[in-house]
Amino acid sequence: MMTLTLVSFLLFVLKAFVVVMFAMNVAVILTWADRRQGAMIQDRVGPNRAVAWIPTKVAQGLALGPALAVIAGVAFVVLKLEPPPEELGARAMLFSQLGIFCTWLTGVVIGGKVQNRGVTNSFDAWLYSLGDPRRIFYGGLFVHFLALFVGLALNDSAYGEQVRTIGYGTGVGLLVLSVLAGAAYAAISINGEPRIGLRLAGLLHPAADGLKTIFKEDFIPPNADKFLHSLAPFVSFFPALVVMAVIPFGDTLCFELGKDGSFGSLITTMPGRAMCTEGAIRLQVVDLDVGLLYFFALAGTGIVGAALAGWASDNKYSLLGGVRAASQMVSYEVTMGLTLVGAVMVYGTLRVDQMIEWQSQNAWGIFVQPLAFFLFFTASVAESKRIPFDIPEGESEIVAGYFTEYAGMKFAMFFFAEYIAVVTSAGLMSAIFLGGWDLPFLYRDGLHVTIGQTLIFEQALPHLAIVLIGALGFVLKTLVLCWLQLMIRWTLPRFRYDQLMRLGWRKLLPASLANVLATGLIVMAIVTGGPAVATFMSLLADYSKALVALAGIGGFIYFIVFLVKPVHKRKSLASTSAQFAHAAGGTRSARMSA
């Protein structure tokens, strides 16, 4: 019992660390993306000027180290974790696709460098002769589909075992060779350089800004309340971070239990809809019966932080910003809570993990509560106090709102808390409306594409692979919702204060009340409808999964086309000053360095 308690505590600490790192790192990426987007729209230098200079030997080690670690991991899986015969096909498909992916990705990256830098050796000359690196990408896609088609077509034939064995060995070989070749090429290409500058597309710039704020002066106005002035950033920062604790980021991991109650090996396969009760590790920090109430209770304390900052700063602009922030957050939290009442009526629980389980067995919440999703999304953007709802910090009206008298690390905590709030709201929307870790037709024993009683395709998958795919799906859904909130910032102008209040109290609040009424009537009609209605709703749920799957495939194809499409920059001379500068020959610009 003591061992199990210690293990549970260590797992709690590990899961909390993973959730905190996920929220904070995504917030850093959002900061970077926000600045990059602003630089592209305003045609100015973006956050790619922060450079970390490191010795060449260290850079070569950074190139070879991860590659050797990946190779060691692959060798361990191949040599120590021999798959049973029924799992050989799935593992062969996985490694063959990974090997093909790493091969063409390495070729595209090196080919792009050669096109920009020029030819330095015979290998560069061969890559240069291929022309546009996009050709390597298109060839890689063709090989992906060819390997997938051959594997599925010959899996149950007389040559199935040979195909699985060849695919497994070839995939492992391609993966190891491509990773090692790419790392070796990077290490050799920088040999002889005195030092190497790491930019990482500007991702180092937010880190440099964070370090800079630590050493800045911590200014406190002379007549300010020093205790409350220092307390306010912490009251805003930590609640935004800990609300992620109730959001599951993956399905349950199931382990075998020993005779003494200790955890054994991971279960390899699971029945379709079964749930393990013993030896289960939930990918969720805390599983509360009132998880949704916990989220809103802690998220609402951010109002206190904004109000304290405005009151304690001894500044009229800060006070106005604090009052605006408090009124705005209170107004839109009412709408956020009411929009989820309909979802709670449908799911019949306040536990977030059970909401996801309901969606995995029926349909995603966005199909069950479409109006609630859009209302909640709008209210969550307003709750995060970002454009077009950044009334509390409107620069043209009240300088910087309740941020005015803050500097250094305290200002950074306020600033960072806003981006973390974007991540947490996106995670909650993903769990309640987009199925969380659930993906269409992916069950606990594998992939089963069925419409009604018709089975179209099925493929058994290992338990660990299904859990990892689900966790990756949750991360992608959260990132997409964060990206949508980021795009709104650079698309819509700021509302006036009266427009903001009118939207919340006269538009969103009545719509959320109407949604609660409509949901109650529809739920009563379905419950009393009998077996025919239940069968019809089940068929609609299958069609909704098919729609999501097709939309996901279409979105992936569009994203790939967007990435490989040549960029054509077009300036829009909207202002008279821009037109005058263009007529005079343009403005001088140069890459900045830090």
Language-model regions: role of each:
Residues 2-594:
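Selective transmembrane helix interface/packing segments
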